[in-house]
């Protein structure tokens, strides 16, 4: 599902309830262009679903509260719905009017990278028009006018009962938060603030309280502290008398708590910086708090004391237990990050979340930011092999992988709803880019079938995914969706939860009654269902639970959905027929259970009028709500079912105080409705009365009666006889043009459940499954329902063995879980034998005992042939898995000579630690090669054809790890080398690591240059690995910058003589540390340059040793068979004690000997 998203990243995250605190927020246009001025908010308490760019959408859990105002680029809005209500307003220059309603039921489907924000669901228009065309005098069609079909407008101005109150002294304040708890309470709280956009902080605040439904207000700054700056207002969703105020964390981190609806407060210090709150859905004093440093705290005393639950919690991935699904009401579900950056799913008790008491319901890691707990379901995502896999737990049972059609191959998925024990999901398949397919699940949320293809999606300003899908309030199973067909977007409607869809029939006439010529399927009505990038421009739809037949939306008539020529439409028969009500966008407020509709026009000008309709939009009357035109910033309806009081927030000018206009609609009603004031209305779909398997008859108030009604729901409901229309195709089946559900090409209907054993029974699907929540009875129910059938005996077939994570690798010394899968066969009476390939084998008597997998630990690395054999009385099957067992590669050391001869083969070896890590790939770079040499062996041989310094690099790939080492080698036609030794005290300070050897080599070279005066370019020193400490000294034929010929062999001999002399005279030494002198001297003659090796002997070193031995033997044989016998000469008088030189004595001649060659005395350099 990409991931389970945490709310709504678009700026339009509005809902009537914010955080269960009853907070509805408004920001004026242009005030906040980024999250810098308005930090992101968190999911609201309204159970709405939103989608994120990477994943599972997240329904804002009940009671989640934002810490700061959310960014909204919009105009003011209506806000009303059952329950508590509050409004957040923000004012800027050039205020515009917009009205929006937020309803719990009118849920739009959205997603975002940010927490879910309050969203208008009940009539919030989203575009701006300047004027209402008088009475709608511009028609949509031509022909004979039918006055009976025209929308009537009464232009006579009527007056509503209203009072105005100014929040004196707050003219500079540009934000306001309003809470109206309702439930027979007359208390309204308003928090106004001055937000400095340059500083990015709140600099002033005021708290106001009304006890007479908003007629008058009292300023409470002295009760909370005159110098206290308040930043946010929270209200307990289960007890509206409990209020919580958050101080500005820039100054202090404190909570002010009230238990008397904000009359008095007590201050409590916080030892953390609060970012969001989550109230418990039942216990009024239980709260979860998320801090800015990603720690989760709990309080059982309504914020008076806090206890740390868990650190490193993923933002918005914490939930209270769901009643009925969890036994413990104080259980907390959360997603936490491990030290190495992985995410895990944890549960624990709010006051006892110790390491020992934490549970891990999902084994292993989950994808980051992917946990969602919603109703009876828990969802997580796990990506393996480059593909996302989605898992669900129903009523906290073990997780099962969610099954889509085999070749859906989703690249993104979002859970839209989990209502009525069923999962509704939007899936973007491998071949889709800007559309999603809608899928609906069985009760357990495991098996999904297609409901609608190619539903339009778009990206919000924060990258959030928005799906054009709307669930109509008050009628179960009714949805509207915008589907993309041949690059045209059309609106479809369903009454049976996606089983059947059809286009919307356009109105027969326009506002004036002129006929509209629109023929299906070429022309239809199209509605805006999504929030646009500017969340309060065109695109609004509204419905109410208490008015199930009435839907108000903006849209257009034509061949496709358009962003131009937008009008307002209403349906009073649940979407069967529609009527145009305005030619410009208005926002709609439902009064008196939907018996009265209030419309307020979008305009940038101040207004003082609104429109009322008592007959479901057929006619409208003009009412004034204030004597002075007002720039409207927002409208808040009275909480509760009746909604007869409305407060309009605005200002007379850009510099004036906030003006609060209380509008009382009670005066427009004559009386309470009696039984004779109602008429019956039957829900239907194009004349079909059976909707979701039942006939439902509602009562509606007669249009000519102006009485206050009471909502009673459906007058009566009776089940229908089941027909084929009450059944959808089962998993693995597809509906064909004749209406039949037939198996998909990839599905084998004869496949049995793996739990099915000979003598048992299984449910044999007929290809159909009843639509969840459908109430039909009898009829074809028996014919289409899966029937129990005896399990036939079958030989094993389709055996597979895989690792639990789908990988072909395992780590040495760690558990690897192997899963045995069998398509067919009697799993209860099948013998399974598993050979791990390392000399260990196990047997099982049935497959059921292996459901959790077979765990095994490999002690050695290598490629192991894992075989599994299954047998029953009817046959057998086998499968093989080649498993690569590795261990982590920790270090790579490149071993090769320091100096080599031109055109001579050089051996390079990659020495590994540990030496056995499994299957490896070696990548070699050397010389001037532009392409590497790739081998499976750790050694290579090569030659250099030119002199100079060359770099060799080896990269070793082991699984996901790649390590490398680089060395430099000098190439010359000839050079001299000598082994060096040191005074024994150096060994005490030798840690035997490459860095130390490089530093000591540099010090020795410096000492040699200082003692001999030989240019440093002629000397190369390499300290060798191991103890005792030794080094190799190389004399190189350096060529200076004047491009003179390089040194001759005789010159190298002269340099060698000087070096040997100084070494023999003990003139080369260095100070390792204060008081520690190290003497450098020659060790012995070497026949070839040595190689920098690890303590283990390499092949090249052994070859050198053998070469020395063979040379020694050859010299011995030659001299043994000489005609003249060589007699030893007495020791040279010039030899010094400790002289490590080795003399090769010549046979004594009969004649006087010739002069010795240069350099014959002292140690000899190897050539």
Swiss-Prot record:
It is a single-pass type I membrane protein. It comes from Mus musculus. The gene is Sorcs1. Residues 1-33 form the signal peptide. Isoform 1 is highly expressed in brain, and at lower levels in heart, liver and kidney. Detected in newborn brain and in adult olfactory bulb and cerebral cortex. Isoform 2 is highly expressed in liver, and at lower levels in heart, brain, kidney and testis. Residues 802-893 form the PKD domain. Residues 34-1098 are lumenal. The chain crosses the membrane at residues 1099-1119. Keywords: Glycoprotein, Membrane, Repeat, Signal, Transmembrane, Transmembrane helix. Gene3D superfamilies: 2.10.70.80, 2.120.10.10, 3.30.60.270, Immunoglobulins, YVTN repeat-like/Quinoprotein amine dehydrogenase. The keyword Membrane applies. Glycans are attached at residues 184, 352, 433, 775, 815, 846, 907, 928. InterPro entries: Ig-like_fold, PKD_dom, PKD_dom_sf, Sortilin_C, Sortilin_N, VPS10, VPS10-sortilin, WD40/YVTN_repeat-like_dom_sf. BNR repeats lie at residues 208-219, 256-267, 492-503, 569-580, 611-622. Residues 38-68, 98-151, 1128-1167 are annotated as: Disordered. This is VPS10 domain-containing receptor SorCS1.
């Amino acid at each position: 599902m990409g991931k389970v998203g945490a709310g709504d990243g678009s700026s339009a995250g509005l809902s009537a309830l914010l955080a269960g605190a009853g907070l509805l927020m408004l920001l004026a246009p242009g005030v906040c262009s980024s999250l810098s001025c308005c930090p992101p908010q968190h999911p609201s308490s309204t159970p709405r679903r939103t989608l994120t760019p990477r994943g599972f959408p997240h329904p804002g859990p009940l009671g989640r509260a934002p810490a700061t105002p959310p960014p909204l680029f919009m105009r003011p809005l209506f806000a009303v719905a059952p329950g508590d209500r509050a409004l957040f307003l923000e004012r800027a220059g050039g205020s515009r009017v917009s009205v929006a309603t937020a309803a719990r039921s009118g849920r739009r489907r959205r997603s975002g990278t940010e927490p879910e924000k309050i969203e208008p669901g009940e009539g919030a228009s989203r575009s701006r028009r300047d004027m209402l065309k008088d009475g709608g005098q511009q028609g949509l069609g031509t022909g004979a006018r039918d006055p009976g079909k025209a929308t009537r407008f009464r232009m006579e101005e009527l007056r509503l009962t209203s009072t105005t109150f100014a929040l004196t002294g707050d003219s500079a304040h540009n934000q306001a938060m309003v809470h109206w708890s309702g439930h027979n309470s007359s208390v309204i709280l308003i928090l106004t603030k001055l937000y400095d956009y340059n500083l990015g902080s709140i600099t002033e605040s005021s708290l106001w309280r009304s006890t007479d439904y908003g007629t008058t207000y009292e300023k409470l700054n002295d009760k909370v502290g005159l110098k206290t700056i308040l930043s946010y207002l929270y209200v307990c969703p289960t007890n509206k008398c409990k209020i919580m105020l958050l101080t500005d964390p820039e100054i202090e981190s404190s909570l002010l708590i009230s238990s008397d609806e904000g009359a008095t407060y007590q201050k409590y210090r916080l030892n953390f910086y609060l970012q969001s709150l989550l109230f418990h859905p039942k216990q009024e004093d239980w709260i979860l708090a998320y801090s800015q440093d990603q720690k989760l705290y709990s309080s059982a005393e309504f914020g008076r004391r806090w206890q740390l639950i868990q650190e490193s919690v993923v933002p918005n991935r914490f939930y209270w237990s769901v009643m009925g699904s969890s036994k413990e009401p104080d259980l907390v579900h959360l997603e936490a990050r491990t030290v190495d950056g992985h995410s895990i799913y944890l549960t624990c008790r709010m006051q006892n979340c110790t390491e020992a008491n934490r549970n891990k319901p999902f084994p292993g890691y989950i994808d980051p930011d992917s946990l969602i707990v919603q109703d009876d379901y828990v969802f997580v995502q796990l990506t393996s092999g480059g593909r996302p896999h989605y898992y669900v737990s129903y009523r906290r049972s073990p997780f099962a992988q969610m099954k889509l059609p085999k070749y859906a191959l989703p690249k993104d998925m979002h859970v839209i709803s989990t209502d009525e024990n069923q999962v509704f999901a939007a899936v973007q398949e491998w071949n889709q880019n800007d559309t999603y397919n809608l899928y609906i699940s069985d009760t357990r949320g495991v098996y999904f079938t297609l409901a609608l293809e190619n539903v339009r999606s778009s990206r919000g300003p924060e990258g959030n995914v928005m799906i054009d899908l709307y669930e109509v309030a008050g009628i179960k199973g009714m949805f509207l969706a915008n589907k993309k067909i041949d690059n045209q977007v059309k609106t479809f409607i369903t009454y049976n939860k996606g089983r059947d869809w059809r286009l919307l029939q356009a109105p027969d006439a326009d506002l004036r009654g002129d006929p509209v010529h629109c023929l299906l399927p070429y022309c239809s009505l199209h509605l805006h269902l999504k929030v646009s990038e500017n969340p309060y421009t065109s695109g609004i739809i509204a419905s109410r639970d208490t008015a199930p037949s009435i839907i108000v939306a903006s849209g257009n008539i034509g061949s496709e959905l358009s962003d131009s020529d937008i009008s307002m439409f209403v349906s009073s028969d649940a979407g069967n027929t529609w009527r145009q009500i305005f030619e410009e966008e208005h926002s709609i407020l439902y009064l008196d259970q939907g018996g009265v509709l209030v419309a307020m026009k979008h305009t940038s000008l101040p207004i003082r009028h609104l429109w009322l309709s008592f007959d479901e939009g057929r006619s409208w009357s003009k009412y004034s709500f204030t004597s002075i035109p007002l720039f409207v910033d927002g409208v808040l309806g009275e909480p509760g079912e009746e909604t007869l009081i409305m407060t309009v927030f605005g200002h007379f000018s850009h510099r004036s105080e906030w003006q609060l206009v209380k509008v009382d609609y009670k005066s427009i009603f004559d009386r309470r409705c009696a039984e004779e004031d109602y008429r019956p209305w039957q829900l239907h779909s194009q004349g079909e009365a059976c909707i979701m398997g039942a006939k439902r008859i509602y009562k509606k108030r007669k249009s000519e009666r102006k009485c206050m009604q009471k909502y009673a729901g459906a007058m009566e409901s009776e089940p229908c006889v089941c027909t084929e229309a009450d059944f959808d195709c089962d998993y693995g089946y597809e509906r064909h043009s004749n209406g039949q559900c037939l198996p998909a090409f990839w599905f084998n209907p004869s496949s049995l459940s793996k739990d099915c054993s000979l003598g048992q029974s299984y449910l044999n699907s007929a290809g159909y499954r009843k639509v969840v929540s459908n109430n039909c009875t009898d009829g074809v129910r028996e014919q289409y329902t899966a029937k129990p059938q005896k399990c036939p005996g079958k030989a094993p077939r389709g055996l597979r063995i895989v690792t639990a994570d789908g990988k072909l690798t395992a780590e040495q010394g760690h558990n690897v879980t192997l899963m045995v899968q069998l398509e067919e066969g009697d799993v209860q009476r099948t013998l399974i034998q598993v050979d791990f390939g390392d000399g260990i084998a196990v047997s099982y008597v049935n497959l059921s005992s292996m459901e959790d997998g077979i765990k095994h630990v490999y002690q050695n690395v290598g490629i192991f042939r894992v075989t599994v054999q299954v047998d029953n009385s009817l046959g057998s099957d086998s499968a093989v898995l080649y498993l690569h067992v590795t261990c982590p590669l920790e270090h790579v050391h490149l071993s090769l000579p320091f100096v080599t001869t031109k055109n001579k083969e050089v051996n390079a070896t990659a020495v590994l630690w540990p030496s056995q890590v499994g299957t490896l790939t070696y990548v070699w770079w050397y010389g001037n090669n532009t392409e590497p040499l790739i081998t499976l062996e750790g050694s290579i041989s090569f030659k250099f054809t030119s002199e100079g310094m060359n770099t060799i690099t080896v990269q070793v790939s082991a699984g996901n790890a790649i390590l490398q080492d680089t060395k430099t080698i000098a190439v010359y036609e000839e050079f001299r080398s000598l082994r060096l030794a040191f005074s024994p005290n150096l060994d005490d300070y030798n840690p035997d690591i490459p860095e130390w050897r490089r530093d000591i080599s540099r010090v020795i070279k410096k000492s040699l240059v200082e003692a001999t005066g030989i240019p440093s370019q002629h000397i190369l020193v390499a300290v060798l690995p191991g103890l005792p400490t030794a080094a190799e000294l190389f004399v190189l034929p350096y060529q200076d910058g004047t491009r003179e010929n390089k040194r001759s062999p005789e010159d190298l001999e002269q340099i060698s003589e000087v070096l040997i002399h100084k070494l023999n005279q003990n003139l080369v030494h260095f100070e390792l540390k204060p008081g520690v002198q190290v003497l450098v001297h020659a060790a012995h003659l070497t026949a070839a340059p040595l190689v920098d090796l690890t303590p283990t002997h390499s092949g090249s070193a052994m070859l050198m040793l053998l070469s020395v031995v063979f040379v020694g033997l050859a010299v011995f044989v030659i001299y043994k068979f000489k005609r003249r016998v060589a007699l030893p000469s007495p020791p040279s008088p010039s030899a010094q004690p400790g002289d490590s030189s080795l003399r090769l004595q010549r046979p004594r001649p009969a004649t006087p000997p010739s002069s010795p060659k240069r350099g014959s005395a002292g140690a000899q350099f190897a050539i």
